[in-house]
């Protein structure tokens, strides 16, 4: 029987090799071996996605490769999901996070990974999807009263819209009732500080650890 390290390494390989079948197999193998699904995702699937993302930024991989890697990860996650849902039903929600990719931006891979990781970590996630109008973030904040609103921007031309979330939350009179978090490829801590966001998420694991720190 393969060791935990070998199974996690295979999970990473499944993503970097764009192998959906292997992703499903290794997810089943991990569950059978009693490996913590969160560890499998963080050290296997997410690590693989980060490697693919880096190669994409360097120009050695292209968008179809990134999409294929994301599909492989989604396939593996589907296998793990029932176990995660079972765990969630046994523990109360740790808090609510509204998340979405900002208006004008159709990219959702990074946001999808973050949403999955938060879900797995025990938070209730309200995923608004991609190309989300600013007013939708605000309306959803009024409706579900989350602790955190997280927006992702994958382009410099759309990250400016993150300023509007801050402004419109103030106009709605609810800015002081919620923490805001920003992330995405062009987004930095300096940008978060400049626009007045409470938190900056550099990676999926960074987001989870910072959300935990704020809410727990």
From Swiss-Prot:
Pathway it works in: One-carbon metabolism; methanogenesis from trimethylamine
Record-linked Pfam families: B12-binding, B12-binding_2
Domain of life: Archaea
Domain B12-binding N-terminal: 1-92
Residues annotated as domain B12-binding: 94-216
Classification via Gene3D superfamilies: Cobalamin-binding domain, Methionine synthase domain
Molecular function GO terms recorded: cobalamin binding; cobalt ion binding; methyltransferase activity
Entry keyword annotation includes DNA damage: no
GO biological process: methanogenesis
UniProt-annotated binding residues for methylcob(III)alamin: 107
UniProt keyword annotations, A-Z: Cobalt, Metal-binding, Methanogenesis, Repeat
Family: Belongs to the methylamine corrinoid protein family.
Assembly and oligomerization: Can form a complex with MttB.
Function, in words: Acts probably as a methyl group carrier between MttB and either MtbA or MtaA.
NCBIfam families noted in UniProt: pyl_corrinoid
Protein's recorded name: Trimethylamine corrinoid protein 1
Protein's organism: Methanosarcina acetivorans (strain ATCC 35395 / DSM 2834 / JCM 12185 / C2A)
